[in-house]
Every structure is written in structure tokens, then in C-alpha cells.
Amino acid sequence: MYSEFAYSYDILMQNVDYQKRTDYLYSLFEKFDRAPTLMLDLACGTGEFSNRFANKGVSVIGVDISYDMLSVAREKSAEQQNDILYLCQDAAELDLYGTVDGAICCLDSLNHITDYGDFCNAIARVSLFLEKDRLFIFDLNTEYKHSCVLGNNTFVIDTNDVYCVWQNEYQGNNTVEINLDFFTREDNVYLRTGESFCERAYTSAEIENALNKAGLKTEAIYEEMSQNEPCDTTQRVVYVTRKM
């Protein structure tokens, strides 16, 4: 899963300021006086957040469903001499060796879980391995973003090494099918690869129901990269939740 995406992911995400986002997330842990010492990075992808938290002195467990994503993550950790445990697991079947005192899930990774039962299970599994009174911070794309921003629109991302055509098809039920065509330059030839997946936005009621069943209390909901309340045109929200 996400095999082709893994090797182009970082190029396509060049506009993401990972350090700024890491500092923002860490500040939320500190705001609630819950700075982690051993943290779960769920759906860690290529390890950008995992390594940046490790550079802050946090011990990190990175979990992702893609072997290829984790391969890239391990290379980064080796280069930075970070000792991070990476596990290839489905979020809905998360199984750690013990508990953690903090958890994150970033960049709409939970939206990739399109089955509501699996969505609830993923949150419940995080809660199971989270110590009492500690925080799980995650973000989600909103219904507005899926219906009005992604919708049936097509985007083009053009870098020196990769040309990507990003096509969206709105499926209803707040779900968008995303089809990516990559054209990667090798020598003087462009190689074409593709990746397809769906993302689903969940209603506030669905999210709160999943949190309640998992024994997590919502401490705050912010517009991403801020401490402002979300509005009707907010594209991504951040949930700060605490295990009861």
C-alpha cells in the first residue's frame, strides 16, 4: 500500500514546514502540561515528525501500514542517528509492546481510513496503549475541504524531479477518491507510476462518538497551526484529546 507514493511523497510535500508543525504540536503538549517522553507517531509515513520529535529528546515509536514508507523513514533515522522503533501495522490493529505517554497522527492520516468501524478501532487502539491522563493529538480534513476544495478538482505539482497530476473524484458521503500519476525523471527519461486511494471526512458527531467509546475526552479543537476555533471554511482541524 502506498508503494509508489513513498518514494515521491517527500518531494510532493516540500511545501510542508515539518519543523514548524513539530514545534506547534510540541507546544500543545506543553500547554496541557503533558510533554511526552515516549510517543507514538501513528501513520508516521517517511518519518519526518518521528525524527523531529526524536531530535527534541523524545523516544518515538513510528507506526505505518506501508513497508516502503517505513524504509524511507529508517534511512532518515540512520542518517540522523536517531534510535526510533518502526513497526509496520494497520492503525485499526495497532499492537505495541507497552504504553506510551503521548501520541500523534498527522497530515490527515486518519482520513485515509474510510470505514467508520476501522476509524473507531484505530482511535480505540491508540487509547489502549496510551497512559491515563495523557494526550493523543491528531488532525483531520474537514467536510468542507473534501466537498469544496478537493471535490472533483485536478491539481498539478511540478518539481525538478517529479511531475504529478492529482485528480480527485468526489464519491459522496464526504469521501474523495484520489488518483495520482507520477512522472519521475531518471536520466533523460520520465517514468510513469500511479497511486490511488480514498479519504473520508467525518462529522463532528462521528468523531466525538469514536472518542467517547475509546475513553478519550476532547480538551480542545483548533484550526490547524493555530489555537483558533475552526470556522465554516476551515480545511483541517486539530483535536487535543486526553485519556480518561
Q: Residue spans of the language-model regions?
A:
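SAM-dependent methyltransferase
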Residues: 137-210
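Conserved class I S-adenosyl-L-methionine
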Residues: 1-43
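A short glycine-rich, Lys/Arg-flanked "PGG" loop and its adjoining helix->strand segment in the class I
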Residues: 120-132
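C-terminal lobe and adjacent flexible extensions of AdoMet/dcAdoMet transferase-like proteins
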Residues: 204-244
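Class I SAM-dependent methyltransferase SAM/SAH-binding core
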Residues: 40, 48-93
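A short acidic, Gly/Pro-enriched loop at the edge of an enzyme's catalytic core
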Residues: 95-102
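Residues lining the SAM
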Residues: 106-108
